[in-house]
Amino acid sequence: MTRDTIPLAGVIGDPISHSLSPRLHGHWLRRYGLQGHYVPLHVNHANLETVLRTLPLMGFVGVNVTLPHKEHVLSIADSVTDRAALIGAANTLTFTANEQIQADNTDGMGFLSNIRQALPGWSASAGPALVLGSGGAAKAIVSALVSDGAPVVHVANRTRARADGLKEQFGARVSPSDWTHIPDLIGDAALIVNTTSLGMAGQSPLSLDLSRLSPPTVVTDIVYAPLQTNLLRDASIRGCETVDGLGMLLHQAVPGFERWFNYTPTVDEDLREAVLAG
């Protein structure tokens, strides 16, 4: 295999130095003995389209996309999957042999796969879901929960208008709520998801009244630094099943790796340890 035929992939963002994706994909490439490279690419908004059109000419087969470019890449892509169009953002770009850009969003799939790996047999159809926050991650997760059969998805946000926007975007099974109503919704929820940055290292804590929280409610947090947030710790103390946020990052990476390197990787404890090792 010549240098020209070794597939190249990467992750684009601004900033990008914090990304765990190079560690993740690098582990898979080494583990499976595959030819390929995965690199971080610091690209600002002004240069985004030029870079994306140039990368296929340099041998790149695709890239992951992180903040702040996940929405803007949709206007650059030549084709967009239905789920990426519905969510309004893409995190995975694939470059075709004729240098076309295909955009997809695998965040929702990664979210569901993370819970199912931790809790085999789990389904969103088990009961109402409560999603905290209404940003980009929330949109992908709400879309996935609705598609997976959640009877109702309550979305609580400090700015009510943003929660209302998700109902307009994803339909009648989405129920917007004020942040102050969270304690009333917790008792009936089969699933509680924190999609905000509250509770992340360096951010303000997530302070909730969990007095009505009890099994069999499942609680998950997309934050993975720390792995056990205060929300997950307190839910565990109350006897609830909890799922940390690292697995969502790992599972959302599977489709891109499969397309770019023609191999289906496994998400397991070895991968978790490699990504967390630093």
UniProtKB/Swiss-Prot annotation:
Binding site for NADP(+): 82, 133-137, 157-162, 222, 245
Record key words, sorted: Amino-acid biosynthesis, Aromatic amino acid biosynthesis, NADP, Oxidoreductase
Pathway field: Metabolic intermediate biosynthesis; chorismate biosynthesis; chorismate from D-erythrose 4-phosphate and phosphoenolpyruvate: step 4/7
UniProt: shikimate binding residues: 19-21, 66, 91, 107, 224
Catalyses which reaction(s): shikimate + NADP(+) = 3-dehydroshikimate + NADPH + H(+)
Superkingdom to which the source organism belongs: Bacteria
E.C. no: 1.1.1.25
GO MF term list: NADP binding; shikimate 3-dehydrogenase (NADP+) activity
Coiled coil: none
Enzyme class name: oxidoreductase
Keyword Transcription assigned: no
A GO term from the CC aspect: cytosol
Signal peptide: none
InterPro entries: Aminoacid_DH-like_N_sf, NAD(P)-bd_dom_sf, Shikimate_DH, Shikimate_DH-bd_N, Shikimate_DH_fam, Shikm_DH/Glu-tRNA_Rdtase
GO biological process: amino acid biosynthetic process; aromatic amino acid family biosynthetic process; chorismate biosynthetic process; shikimate metabolic process
Active site: 70 (proton acceptor)
Function (record text): Involved in the biosynthesis of the chorismate, which leads to the biosynthesis of aromatic amino acids. Catalyzes the reversible NADPH linked reduction of 3-dehydroshikimate (DHSA) to yield shikimate (SA).
Family membership noted in the UniProt record: Belongs to the shikimate dehydrogenase family.
NCBIfam families: aroE, PRK00258.1-4
Subunit organization: Homodimer.
Protein name as it appears in the record: Shikimate dehydrogenase (NADP(+))
Lineage summary: Bacteria, Pseudomonadati, Pseudomonadota, Alphaproteobacteria, Rhodobacterales
Gene, per the UniProt record: aroE
